[in-house]
Amino acid sequence: MVVVDARGSYCPGPLMEMIKTLKQVEVGEVVEVLSSDESSAKDIPEWVKKAGHELVEVKKEEDYWRIVVKKLK
């Protein structure tokens, strides 16, 4: 699993960092995004669905969101 720690960054920062990372990993790999920006919990899942990847988990932690995505293509 590759972790993208985008805490402290605001949208579209976390989304852009995740997209960049997804381009670098192999199909089937999992990317975990950590974001303190609440809008990431909405924006990233929308993009993942449109892009054809799998949204594994969206979870609110104490002071950030954990968004887990699996690259499907």
From Swiss-Prot:
Active site: 11
Top-level taxon of the source organism: Archaea
Signal peptide (from-to): none
Gene3D superfamilies: TusA-like domain
InterPro entries in the cross-refs: TusA-like, TusA-like_sf
Similarity comment: family membership: Belongs to the sulfur carrier protein TusA family.
Protein name: Putative sulfur carrier protein AF_0556
Organism: Archaeoglobus fulgidus (strain ATCC 49558 / DSM 4304 / JCM 9628 / NBRC 100126 / VC-16)
Lineage, uppermost ranks: Archaea, Methanobacteriati, Methanobacteriota, Archaeoglobi, Archaeoglobales
